[in-house]
Swiss-Prot record:
It comes from Cyriopagopus hainanus (Chinese bird spider). It is found in: Secreted. The keyword Secreted applies. Residues 4-33 form the BPTI/Kunitz inhibitor domain. GO terms for biological process: envenomation resulting in negative regulation of voltage-gated potassium channel activity in another organism. One of its GO terms (molecular function) is toxin activity. Belongs to the venom Kunitz-type family. 02 (native) subfamily. One of its GO terms (cellular component) is extracellular region. Keywords: Protease inhibitor, Secreted, Serine protease inhibitor. Expressed by the venom gland. This is Kunitz-type serine protease inhibitor hainantoxin F7-25.66. Serine protease inhibitor that inhibits trypsin at a molar ratio of 1:1. The record marks K14, A15 as: Reactive bond for trypsin. The keyword Secreted applies.
Length: 33
């Protein structure tokens, strides 16, 4: 699985994990949790 191609899903947990998604032009970072 190419993790950079996954959608940006922030989730419902109270943790804070760094994740990546493809924003249409580049692989971008977001915080999950």
């Amino acid at each position: 699985i190419d993790t950079c191609r996954l959608p940006s899903d922030r989730g419902r947990c109270k943790a804070s994990f760094e994740r990546w998604y493809f924003n249409g032009r580049t692989c971008a970072k977001f915080i999950y949790g």
